[in-house]
């Protein structure tokens, strides 16, 4: 027998939304930090291939 679900409170909804937004903000901050480290040349935690032009051909 189908029973309607209880309505989720505004507080619970806002809490879930805040957690979701915080995770997205953390991911964006990490990506920005990684990009800055790549551009500054101080990246040490991963392999980043740098394309070098060969003029000896």
From Swiss-Prot:
It comes from the Bacteria. Keywords: Ribonucleoprotein, Ribosomal protein. The gene is rpmF. InterPro entries: Ribosomal_bL32 (IPR002677), Ribosomal_bL32_plant/cyanobact (IPR044958), Ribosomal_zn-bd (IPR011332). SUPFAM superfamilies: Zn-binding ribosomal proteins. GO terms for molecular function: structural constituent of ribosome. One of its GO terms (cellular component) is large ribosomal subunit. One of its GO terms (biological process) is translation. The keyword Nuclease does not apply. Gene3D superfamilies: Single helix bin. Residues 1-23 are annotated as: Disordered. Belongs to the bacterial ribosomal protein bL32 family. This is Large ribosomal subunit protein bL32. Pfam families: Ribosomal_L32p. Residues 1-20 have a biased composition (Basic residues).
